[in-house]
């Protein structure tokens, strides 16, 4: 475990990075914690790295990054993971999914952290899933997977409509004798029966701007 002097160095690096956007010099660190020898400061920094509290890039001068372990040692909340918002999907009849390079992200909810790295977010258009609280304009967290159990809420892609290009929808999934049933959660809408379907992922969470 790092000594008190080392934690003081770690805290000074953190504060200066937040203040200026880059880490302090070794001399500045020494002055801040009462060490006149730069070699002694280097020794403390090396031990902080050995403890996993910070990381140095040997190819760049003054390139120091405080790790999540280091932030915890300072009592700083960890940076939450982020999930990319990659496009639009319908909660109605299947439409061509609008996909894009992610430029927007949502923080990963704590109850979905176990799926970190396997999630994406889609905006929902339509009202076919309102009985289970997925409304027009909501965003759904989707865990990437290419399979589903009967009754799962999924993002499904089918080529049975339009010009044969893949079209996506959010529905409850059922595999039946000679077809797949994509079941809406809206009493006014009929199920969608298709022969060809690909599962893009399972819906595991919901985001709504008005209440989140």
Curated annotation (Swiss-Prot):
HAMAP family in alphabetical order: LexA
Protein role: Represses a number of genes involved in the response to DNA damage (SOS response), including recA and lexA. In the presence of single-stranded DNA, RecA interacts with LexA causing an autocatalytic cleavage which disrupts the DNA-binding part of LexA, leading to derepression of the SOS regulon and eventually DNA repair.
Gene name in the database record: lexA
InterPro entries to which the protein is assigned, alphabetical: ArsR-like_HTH, LexA, LexA-like, LexA/Signal_pep-like_sf, LexA_DNA-bd_dom, LexA_repressor, Peptidase_S24_LexA, Peptidase_S24_S26A/B/C
Protein keywords: Autocatalytic cleavage, DNA damage, DNA repair, DNA replication, DNA-binding, Hydrolase, Repressor, SOS response, Transcription, Transcription regulation
Organism domain of life: Bacteria
NCBIfam families: lexA
Protein name: LexA repressor
Catalytic site: 128, 171
Sites marked Cleavage: 91-92
Cross-referenced SUPFAM superfamilies: LexA/Signal peptidase (SSF51306), Winged helix' DNA-binding domain (SSF46785)
DNA-binding region coordinates: 26-46
Subunit structure: Homodimer.
Enzyme class: hydrolase
A Gene Ontology biological process term: proteolysis
Catalysis performed (reactions): Hydrolysis of Ala-|-Gly bond in repressor LexA
Presence of the UniProt keyword Transcription in the record: yes
Signal peptide: none
E.C. number(s) listed in UniProt: 3.4.21.88
Record Pfam families: LexA_DNA_bind, Peptidase_S24
KW Transcription regulation (keyword) present: yes
Family, as annotated: Belongs to the peptidase S24 family.
Any GO MF annotation of the entry: serine-type endopeptidase activity
Higher taxonomy: Bacteria, Bacillati, Bacillota, Bacilli, Lactobacillales
């Amino acid at each position: 475990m790092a000594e008190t002097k080392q934690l003081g160095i770690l805290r000074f690096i953190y504060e200066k990075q937040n203040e200026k956007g880059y880490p302090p010099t070794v001399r500045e660190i020494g002055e801040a914690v009462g060490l006149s020898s730069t070699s002694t400061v280097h020794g403390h920094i090396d031990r902080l790295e050995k403890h996993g509290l910070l990381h140095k890039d040997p190819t760049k001068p003054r390139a120091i990054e405080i790790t999540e372990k280091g932030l915890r040692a300072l009592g700083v909340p960890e940076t939450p993971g982020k999930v990319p918002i990659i496009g639009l999907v319908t909660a109605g009849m299947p439409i061509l999914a609008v996909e894009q390079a992610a430029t927007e992200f949502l923080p990963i909810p704590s109850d979905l952290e176990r799926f970190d790295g396997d999630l994406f977010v889609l905006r929902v258009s339509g009202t076919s899933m309102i009985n289970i609280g997925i409304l027009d304009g909501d965003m759904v967290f989707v865990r990437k997977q290419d399979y589903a159990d009967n009754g799962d809420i999924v993002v499904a892609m089918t080529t049975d409509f339009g010009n044969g290009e893949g079209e996506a929808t959010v529905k409850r999934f059922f595999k039946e004798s000679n077809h797949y049933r994509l079941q809406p959660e809206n009493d006014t809408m009929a199920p969608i029966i298709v022969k060809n379907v690909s599962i893009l992922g399972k819906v595991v969470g919901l985001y709504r701007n008005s209440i989140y």
